């Protein structure tokens, strides 16, 4: 178990939840990303799986601009600002200059991403650590993520997936087992401001969510979670 000094916050995007046409949803998403960055959310995962690689790269560029505009930190404080990760697409993350990639359980292994970095024309400089997060659904997945050099893991679904019948919750006991891994494990899946403390008590280093951040004022969510 590797605990954080404070509850880590991981906002996962889904622009389909916003109202309006595509331009309106895109504007709403970028506004929410800026809001998250302005209150110090640690990580944002751009998870817009319907977009082509080119469309995702363009959106990632706009998202990075929103993050950087909303966090007026000095260059040497880069590690303290919100970090933008791209869902699944290491190639897009590198091309866009994102801070990392979030790997699904059926993606390449974290250590393989390091090989991709070595071969990429867009590889980060020696001073920029490219983050690799890994999805996990069992304790074995979390230990595998540790052995394959992921920076952190996201365990799901702790309390199930809202609106998806037939997706049973993994439960707090399973989360507790996953948190025995020597990397940070964040909790995802049905987590609310009311039950988040149970995840932290089970050993989670932080909370990952879509609706918790998108449907509420992020400043209020961040304050509540970091008070736990």
Where are these regions (language model features)?
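C-terminal binding/interaction regions
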Residues: 207
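EAL-family c-di-GMP phosphodiesterase catalytic domain
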Residues: 163-164
């Amino acid at each position: 178990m590797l605990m954080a000094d404070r509850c880590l916050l991981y906002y996962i995007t889904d622009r389909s939840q916003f109202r309006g046409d595509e331009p309106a949803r895109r504007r709403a998403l970028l506004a929410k990303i800026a809001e998250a960055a302005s209150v110090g959310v640690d990580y944002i995962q751009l998870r817009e799986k319907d977009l082509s690689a080119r469309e995702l790269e363009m959106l990632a560029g706009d998202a990075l601009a929103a993050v950087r505009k909303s966090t007026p930190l000095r260059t040497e404080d880069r590690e303290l600002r919100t970090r933008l990760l791209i869902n699944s697409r290491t190639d897009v993350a590198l091309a866009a200059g994102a801070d990392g990639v979030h790997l699904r359980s059926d993606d390449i292994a974290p250590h393989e991403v390091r090989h991709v970095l070595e071969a990429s024309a867009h590889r980060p400089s020696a001073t920029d650590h490219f983050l690799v997060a890994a999805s996990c659904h069992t304790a074995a997945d979390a230990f595998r993520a540790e052995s394959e050099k992921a920076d952190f893991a996201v365990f799901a679904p702790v309390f199930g997936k809202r609106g998806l019948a037939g997706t049973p919750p993994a439960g707090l006991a399973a989360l507790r087992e996953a948190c025995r891994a020597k990397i940070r494990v964040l909790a995802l899946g049905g987590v609310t401001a009311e039950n988040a403390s149970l995840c932290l008590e089970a050993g989670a280093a932080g909370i990952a969510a879509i609706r918790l951040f998108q449907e509420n004022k992020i400043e209020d969510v961040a304050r509540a979670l970091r008070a736990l």
